[in-house]
Regions:
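Alpha-helical transmembrane segments of multi-pass membrane proteins
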Residues: 96-109, 136-153, 179-188, 354-368, ...
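Short helix-coil transition sites and intra-membrane helix breaks within transmembrane domains
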Residues: 19-23, 59-62, 73-83, 109-122, ...
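Long, contiguous bundles of hydrophobic transmembrane helices that form the permeation core
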Residues: 6, 38, 181-310, 427-428, ...
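Re-entrant/interfacial helical elements at transmembrane boundaries that shape
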Residues: 70, 84-86, 117-130, 159-171, ...
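Hydrophobic core segments of alpha-helical transmembrane domains in multi-pass membrane transport
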Residues: 5-17, 28-37, 66-71, 105-110, ...
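Hydrophobic alpha-helical transmembrane segments of multi-pass integral membrane proteins
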Residues: 63-69, 92-129, 322-330, 351-389
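Core transmembrane alpha-helical segments of multi-pass membrane transporters/permeases
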Residues: 25-28, 48-83, 108, 275-340
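Interfacial loop-to-transmembrane junctions
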Residues: 89, 93, 424-445
Length: 463
């Protein structure tokens, strides 16, 4: 019964998200409904002590990233930089390659360490402009961005600095470059299968006479009265964000050390911060600030008259995206604390093959919690020792465990209630009903990829 309660809460939230209801409202309703059916006396403590703690903790850490990312994306749009880059890309590659260009831009940014949430805000203006000029249905933008930002550069490509590739290293004593050949094989599979799927969907739409669409929501502004800047100037803030993010990731620990104690005259006690936990967040915030300043410096004349309204729009978008994701994060924390979740975790331990066991466990928990990093953290915290023991018994290198766990986390995490999916749809002005089925197909490709990697390892022994 406890398992049914947990799954029912998940089903309710997924249904609410798919039908367009606010996740900010339904995440606590679904989570606390499950608590009510489990232990009515625990509803209030679970809401305050688990749901709100996790939700507020997420906002505390990540809202500045959402805000700066939204402002950066809006300025890229208002300055005409997005149109300039799109025009150059179309001249270079032609309109037939619009989806490939967007996938590669997303991949470049995420592999450079830019948060996938930031990529959504920053790339959407480019994608909308390119899809409009190429007359590709707007509903395919989310799946295209998802392929570039939420898949192979998130957890498969060796060396990626995304958190999904870092978490396994703390459990298996590996590095971000673990099992490089398996990672490359997984990357090639996801990229090729994903592009084939997107191209197939585009061809089907073209045959049906479906174009970009009309009367759409949240469309980037397309001012016709501005002179388009040089595409290299337009591209420079985007490149600068990736480069500075990488540099700040190395500089911040050198400046502050492992911990930093802040003691200002008005403080009753010093505040000690563990720098390692905040390095990635501080780095991307600093990089985005520099990117914003670059856009303002190069495009202020075009932006000036629209800056007030544009900044309001960006702040509104950031608030909605952050609250959606934080509410989902709180939901996952509550569900993970229920008896049904523990029963499910224990059942998963019974799967005999260590790599298949790990892959199924991580991807299922990522799906239930709606978070790749959250599901993987829960799975590895509870079961990493058993995975390691089984791997040693089967002579499987721990590097393979790392790569399988990372890739599995990015499989079923993108179900309808996933925070990144909700953010992506909110930013693009689309609904689950309009665009989610294409995202789900990318999810299936990504889920299948980890089993392709496992089969490759057993067939060849390559690592």
């Amino acid at each position: 019964m406890s398992v049914i309660i947990a799954l029912a809460a998940l089903a309710l939230l997924m249904l609410a998200a798919y039908r367009g209801y606010s996740v900010i409202l339904f995440a606590p309703i679904a989570a606390l409904g499950a608590v009510l059916l489990t232990d009515p006396s625990a509803v209030a403590p679970a809401f305050t002590g688990v749901f709100m703690e996790k939700m507020v903790g997420f906002i505390k850490l990540y809202f500045p990233v959402f805000l700066l990312g939204a402002v950066f994306g809006k300025l890229i749009e208002l300055s005409g930089f997005s149109r300039s880059i799109v025009a150059a890309a179309i001249r270079l590659l032609g309109t037939r390659q619009a989806m490939l260009v967007i996938v590669l831009v997303c991949a470049l940014l995420t592999y450079g360490g830019v948060s996938l949430f930031v990529v959504v805000f920053a790339v959407y203006p480019f994608a909308a402009e390119m899809f409009r000029q190429s007359n590709i249905p707007k509903r395919l933008i989310p799946a295209t961005i998802a392929l570039g930002a939420f898949s192979f550069t998130m957890d498969a490509l060796p060396g990626t600095p995304q958190i999904q590739n870092i978490i396994p290293s703390t459990f298996f004593n590996t590095t971000a470059w673990a099992a490089p050949w398996l990672g490359v094989i997984g990357t090639i599979f996801v990229f090729c299968a994903g592009m084939l799927f997107l191209q197939r969907q585009r061809n089907k739409a073209q045959k049906a006479g479906e174009g970009y669409g009309t009367e759409l929501r949240n469309e980037p502004e397309t001012a016709e009265d501005i002179q388009l800047p040089n595409p290299w100037i337009a591209l420079s803030p985007l490149l600068m964000v990736g480069i500075m993010n990488l540099l700040f990731t190395h500089w911040i620990p050198l400046w502050y050390g492992k911990t930093h104690s802040l003691a200002l005259p008005g403080m009753t006690a010093p505040v000690t911060t563990e720098i390692a936990k905040l390095t990635a967040i501080w780095a991307v915030q600093a990089a985005l600030l520099i990117g914003i300043l670059m856009v303002l410096a190069f495009g202020f004349s075009a932006i000036r008259s629209k800056l007030a309204e544009g900044s309001k729009s960006a702040v509104s978008g950031a608030l909605l995206a952050a609250m959606n994701t934080a509410s989902e994060y709180g939901f996952g924390a509550v569900i993970a604390s229920l008896p049904g979740f523990l029963v499910l975790a224990d059942w998963l331990k019974s799967i005999p093959n260590p790599l298949v066991n790990e892959a199924i466990t991580v991807t299922l928990l990522a799906g239930i919690t709606g978070s790749a990093s959250g599901g993987m953290s829960i799975a590895l915290a509870a079961m990493s020792e058993s995975f390691i023991s089984a791997a040693h018994a089967a002579n499987i290198p721990l590097e393979v465990l790392h790569r399988v766990a990372a890739m599995a986390s990015g499989g079923m995490d993108t179900l309808p209630h996933n925070g990144a999916v909700i953010t992506l749809l909110a930013v693009t002005g689309l609904t689950h009903r309009e665009a989610y089925k294409d995202i789900f197909c990318i999810t299936l490709i990504k889920t299948l990829a980890v089993f392709v990697v496992i089969a490759t390892f057993y067939a060849t022994g390559i690592v």
